[in-house]
Amino acid sequence: MAKLIYAAISSLDGYVADSDGNFDWSMPDEEVHRFVNGLERDIGIYLYGRRMYEVMRYWDTAPTGNGEPSAEQEFAKTWQAADKIIYSRTLDSVSTARTRLEHDFGVQAIQQLKATATRDIAVSGPTLAAQALSNGLVDECHLFLSPIVVGGGTAALPDNVRLQLELLDERRFGNGVVYLRYHVNG
């Protein structure tokens, strides 16, 4: 059975984007990017909402040859090799390879996906992750805390959801980012 993993890069005060929608402060440096790539190798399916898909679809045509930073090349190859499911009621179609569009994020469908997937599944974006967390579908949370306080914006974790977490791993990076890996206790 595959794990459903929610990963997010957030500010120290818990936001994935500031109140203006900016998240440029969250771009990983080479060290963090290589670490993320190691985690992403186990992902076979990405689950995105519309907004996150619009950000991530860059990787479908990202350069994978010489001249690009090697961590970015590696991530592009990993992303291109994975399946993607986009949940949106406003999109009519998707343009990236290995991608399908669904209109509803159904609990039973995700449970079935977890039961049949041969590799782990990543849910990305705080809105879609909130649905998965609220319905008890997430097995692990991978949080990267950036050394910045933005004072408001889009929260990484939903309001009104109580989770009992068990710390599985932690790591500090040279740029001040801290990685925390938690198991979500049912």
Where do the language-model regions lie?
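Enzymes that bind and transform nitrogen-containing heteroaromatic metabolites
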Residues: 1-186
